[in-house]
């Protein structure tokens, strides 16, 4: 099997590298996916922060508060480097339970505070520091769009015990985290083409906002990713 590890050694990020902090609700799939992009560019550092005390959006919010803004904070947003913080979440029952809206409000407050910080750096243009990348029903819809241009057919999905099992069944051999993330550009195009929001402006079924995070990553790794695809 031809993999990224075989053809491309990790590059060490420079001191001033742009950092993308990704707080995700999964401990396996999401970290495995984003690990692919670590070291693909010396100008980008991908930092995945898995859940520690639960995966619901409020627990992830508390985790970010402690990691970035607590007394013993571990990470720091560098506005001059345009660092960003992303929450990668599933819709699950969180929407119904009202746990996603507070997370989006949290990001809005961080972005408002960031506007004040930008004033310290006249050369830094305002940008969206904190972002939510919600997938409906789950992160697996993002994996699905690496291979398919059209939305899933509801009847086909319903014939499987779960959406995750459906995606595993339609991708031959299942999603390979050592090579399939190289299809990032296709995933962005396909998910954007099929992106729909509901009446509450949240991603509708089979829609994902992860393409926005994908676009940010692609901006740094595109050239090396193209070379990697050609070798794979």
Segments from the language model and where they lie:
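C-terminal accessory helical subdomains adjacent to catalytic cores in phosphodiester-
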Residues: 1-21, 29-52, 70-232
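Eukaryotic endosomal/vacuolar membrane-trafficking regulators centered on PX-domain-mediated PI3P pathways
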Residues: 56-66
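Phosphate-binding/switch region of NTP-binding enzymes
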Residues: 25
């Amino acid at each position: 099997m031809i993999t990224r590890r075989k053809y491309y050694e990790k590059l060490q990020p420079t001191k001033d590298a742009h950092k993308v902090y990704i707080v995700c609700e999964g401990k396996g799939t999401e970290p495995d996916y984003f690990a692919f992009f670590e070291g693909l560019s010396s100008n980008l550092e991908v930092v995945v922060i898995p859940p520690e005390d639960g995966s619901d959006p409020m627990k992830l919010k508390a985790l970010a508060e402690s990691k970035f803004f607590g007394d013993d904070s571990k990470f720091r947003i560098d506005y001059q480097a345009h660092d960003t913080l992303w929450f990668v979440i599933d819709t699950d029952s969180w929407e119904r339970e009202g746990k996603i809206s507070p997370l989006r409000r949290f990001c809005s407050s961080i972005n408002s505070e960031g506007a004040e910080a930008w004033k310290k750096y006249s050369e830094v243009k305002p940008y969206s520091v904190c972002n939510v990348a919600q997938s409906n029903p789950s992160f697996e819809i993002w994996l699905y769009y690496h291979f398919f241009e059209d939305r899933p057919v509801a009847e086909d999905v319903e014939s499987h015990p779960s959406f995750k099992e459906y995606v595993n069944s339609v991708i031959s051999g299942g999603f390979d985290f050592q090579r399939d993330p190289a299809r990032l550009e296709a995933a962005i195009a396909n998910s954007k083409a099929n992106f729909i929001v509901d009446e509450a402006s949240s991603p509708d079924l089979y829609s994902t906002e992860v393409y926005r995070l994908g676009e940010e990553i692609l901006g740094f790794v595109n050239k090396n990713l193209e070379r990697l695809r050609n070798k794979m």
